[in-house]
């Protein structure tokens, strides 16, 4: 979870009211933060804020916390309003960046008055959003520039690796290749673009370089100081919705410092957009649902008032509420998310505890304990555990695994339904558009993101997959699986099979392998795993085409098994 430092004096200046340290400890809860530490430095009191929500980047700075507290205390209510004036600035996006880093969104913020603390918060927010929300700049990278040194129009273009500019913190020009090899940020983030035919570059009309996304800004325009009054903000990445949200978070935070937001026209090959877009988002909820789940007797008017303290504009109609909420939030996906905001505004500490009406004695779930036993075995074999996302997409589960959609990744034990993914009807991003049916693609993605790390790489995951089962009420079934992948120059089928042998031995199970054909694996080096006459998994050496699809240059051997048919209570 993100942690960041804030000055008590700066927070109180933004809120417009002073509080004791003890009062601040309670106030931080409104911003889904905990006060992790307090210290004094040069006569000033500082707080270490520990955010407890990775879905609210708008709360990862002093500006966001102060804004939330003003609303929570009733000093303001309803939808925060930010005026966006249209500028005549245009950014042209090069179509060659389509497979490199395709999207950029931009804004101008004028009239800033930045002291040292405001500058620290701006840099902190930029870094935290890119690190956590942007997954270490892979999905979101942010640049902020002195706009007075920029000559529009601006071009986000594909550049030859031999082009040169002076990177931030240096005095001499370096080629783009040299920056990746010698600059601290190039070494840290260079793997994101190193293998691409071109590198992204943001330049103005005079050819002056603003930045090399997602690596480093230029010394000319990328050094923002307390003397800077007008800034140009750029956000690049792979998902237009995600980078738009990041832009909204940054510009509204700067607006809390008195900045005036101006939009920028962004021209792509086949469409154009105006950014930022601060149009409020909409959601509908029934207040009876809120009352029932909250367990608190609240009137419609009381719920409306609580929501207005959490940035909502509320329109009541026949027990339903039409809600509008700010464009710097993207965490409202279900009525439960609205309920959470109601309870935060109400105050969790104000909810009276009730004794359970049933006398029960708790204990750990036996199958979960079995999963932990399997994890301990894997760690004992020298494997490193990874935890990847349940959400994925059809390309990762099928195309990159050299499978046509509809082929079995491998069959579910006990019966053989059509190999269909559980897909999301309205995904927030194409990357997260389905629930995974098998784990090996997740491990392949992990390996593809760590090709710059030392080999051998020996990883495993015990995780959930979701399969379609028409006999279930929900038409789906969640299955726990174990997957192992080993990558190094001399890895073989035998090496990964030895781990499978040992797992089965420790669980007191006998198994057999039956050779099969499977496009994800090398022919003749793949088999299905059978226990008690049931197919429970697959094992083999990954096909070179799959390795190429994932950008992995090392051989990989892997296996995956369902855990439920391996579960035997005596082994806990």
Curated annotation (Swiss-Prot):
CC terms in the record's Gene Ontology section: phenylalanine-tRNA ligase complex
Protein name: Phenylalanine--tRNA ligase beta subunit
Entry keyword set: Aminoacyl-tRNA synthetase, ATP-binding, Cytoplasm, Ligase, Magnesium, Metal-binding, Nucleotide-binding, Protein biosynthesis
Subunit (UniProt): Tetramer of two alpha and two beta subunits.
Enzyme class: ligase
Pfam entry (one): B5
Compartment(s) where it occurs, according to its Swiss-Prot or TrEMBL record: Cytoplasm
One of the GO BP terms on file: phenylalanyl-tRNA aminoacylation
Family statement: Belongs to the phenylalanyl-tRNA synthetase beta subunit family. Type 2 subfamily.
GO molecular function: ATP binding; magnesium ion binding; phenylalanine-tRNA ligase activity; RNA binding
Reactions that this protein is recorded to catalyse: tRNA(Phe) + L-phenylalanine + ATP = L-phenylalanyl-tRNA(Phe) + AMP + diphosphate + H(+)
UniProt cofactor(s): Mg(2+)
InterPro entries: aa-tRNA-synth_II/BPL/LPL (IPR045864), B3/B4_tRNA-bd (IPR005146), DNA-bd_dom_put_sf (IPR009061), Phe-tRNA-ligase_IIc_bsu (IPR045060), Phe-tRNA-synth_IIc_bsu_arc_euk (IPR004531), Phe-tRNA_synthase-like_B3/B4 (IPR020825), Phe_tRNA_ligase_beta2_arc (IPR022918), PheRS_beta_core (IPR041616)
Sites where the protein binds Mg(2+): 331, 337, 340-341
SUPFAM superfamilies referenced in this protein's UniProt entry, alphabetically: Class II aaRS and biotin synthetases (SSF55681), PheT/TilS domain (SSF56037), Putative DNA-binding domain (SSF46955)
EC number: 6.1.1.20
Gene name tied to this protein: pheT
B5 domain ranges (all copies): 278-353
